[in-house]
């Protein structure tokens, strides 16, 4: 049975809080860790220094990565924004979360990371882009994050408004308020305030930046740093310089957040995870900047495809004393793993009734265990696209528009150029059969007595 009554979660809070506190003490902490999830928007795997970018600098992210673990095989759950975010919020595949397209709502009965951690005594906040569906059924607004476990919210509920990098208004809780400034600066300011107000409760802070989603824009002083450094098709509109400036400003704002954690003496017991919701886009609103800069290098594809460039994303995690500094994780990390991993960090476990697909990877990041042997799945059948994918170990199966299954060794062939299906017929057949069986688990009707859609 799915837990679908918010009162059930609140009623369980006292018991769960005791359990969480005991778990944290057993792990050597008197206080459960603060947890910070930083999500970039359409940032390519190759856009950050810790993955080899040299044309611009990301010193704060690189420093964080050096103090923790770089997740070399980190995968988003989807190739576009809303399905990806719903998946990591719930720990579920897109076919189980109820959000498979950009215009779908997160079902109200789904338990999010914020709800799960709040029931464990955490204060929760989301600052940034929510993007969990357009209004439906006569509602005036999309499903609100404060109805899904967040105590505080500041940002966009309407994803199309996130195209505006200098917004005139944002949502502060449920109110629309006037604002002025560059969006990622505003979000960081609010995060600094939240961290500064931290009291006795541990907190879960999710900050979903707008960089580097189109339309691209950045503060003039950042753009000037890169003007003339790239071969622009139109020097009067330095799109590549602007893209580099967006990523630089993103890194600068993350540095501000880390500095505030340090100032408050919180960094030593804070788990920080950084990633992107999907790969970089080569679409027209981006002006071709990501394509010219090869943001997804060395991978094939982009946002809205299930090639590595669409779903393999930058990732790193830092938790001093728990995650060894300077480590690299070559195990597969899927963003549906965040919910169970965060709960484990808080000293708790996932309620089986939530039917979470992800697994706790904290022992893997701590180098206490190998990654689980599992097959992971993706589907993208919307907006004129039709692609399916499955990964097990080094191998990835891709099926495009119902065509012949293609098999790639994405460790030795990360660009997915050499189809080895013919030389691995049994594995190709097994993965294709598993993919078909997975699709049959789609949740399209009533679950736990509730009509999910």
Language model features with spans:
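Formylglycine-dependent sulfatase
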Residues: 2-3, 15, 20-406, 412-453
């Amino acid at each position: 049975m799915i837990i679908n009554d918010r009162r059930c979660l609140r009623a369980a809070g006292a018991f769960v809080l005791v359990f969480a506190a005991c778990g944290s003490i057993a792990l050597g902490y008197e206080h459960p860790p603060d947890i910070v999830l930083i999500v970039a928007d359409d940032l390519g795997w190759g856009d950050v220094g810790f993955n080899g970018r040299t044309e611009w600098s990301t010193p704060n992210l690189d420093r964080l990565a050096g103090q923790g673990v770089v997740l070399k095989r980190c995968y988003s759950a989807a190739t576009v924004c809303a399905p990806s975010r719903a998946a990591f919020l719930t720990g579920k595949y897109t076919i189980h979360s109820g959000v498979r397209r950009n215009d779908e709502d997160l079902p109200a009965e789904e338990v999010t990371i914020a709800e799960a951690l709040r029931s464990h005594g955490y204060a929760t906040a989301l600052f940034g882009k929510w993007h969990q569906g357009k209004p439906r059924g006569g509602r005036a607004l999309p499903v609100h994050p404060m109805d899904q476990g967040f105590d505080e919210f500041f940002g966009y509920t309407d994803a199309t408004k996130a195209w505006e990098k200098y917004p005139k208004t944002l949502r502060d809780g449920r109110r629309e308020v006037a604002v002025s400034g560059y969006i990622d600066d505003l979000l960081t300011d609010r995060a600094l305030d939240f961290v500064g107000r931290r009291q006795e409760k541990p907190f879960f802070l999710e900050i979903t930046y707008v960089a580097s989603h189109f339309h691209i824009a950045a503060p003039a002083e950042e753009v000037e740093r890169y003007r003339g450094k790239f071969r622009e098709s139109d020097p009067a509109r330095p799109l590549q310089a602007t893209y580099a400036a967006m990523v630089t400003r993103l890194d600068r704002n993350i540095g501000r957040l880390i500095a505030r954690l340090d100032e408050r003496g919180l960094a030593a017991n804070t788990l920080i995870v950084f990633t992107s919701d999907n790969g970089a886009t080569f679409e027209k609103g981006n002006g071709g900047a990501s394509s010219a800069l090869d943001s997804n290098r060395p991978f094939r594809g982009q946002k809205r495809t299930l090639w590595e460039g669409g779903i393999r994303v930058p990732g790193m995690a830092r938790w001093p004393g728990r995650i060894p500094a300077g480590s690299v994780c070559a195990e597969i990390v899927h963003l549906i793993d965040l919910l169970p991993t965060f709960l484990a960090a808080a000293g708790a476990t996932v309620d089986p009734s939530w039917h979470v697909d992800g697994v706790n990877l904290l022992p893997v990041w701590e180098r206490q265990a190998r990654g689980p042997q599992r097959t992971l799945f993706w589907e993208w059948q919307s907006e004129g696209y039709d692609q399916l994918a499955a990964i097990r170990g080094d191998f990835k199966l891709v099926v495009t528009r119902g065509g012949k299954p293609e098999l790639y060794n994405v460790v030795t062939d990360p660009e997915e150029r050499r189809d080895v299906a013919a030389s691995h017929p049994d594995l190709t057949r097994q993965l294709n059969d598993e993919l078909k069986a997975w699709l049959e688990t789609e949740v399209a009707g009533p679950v736990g007595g509730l009509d999910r859609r």
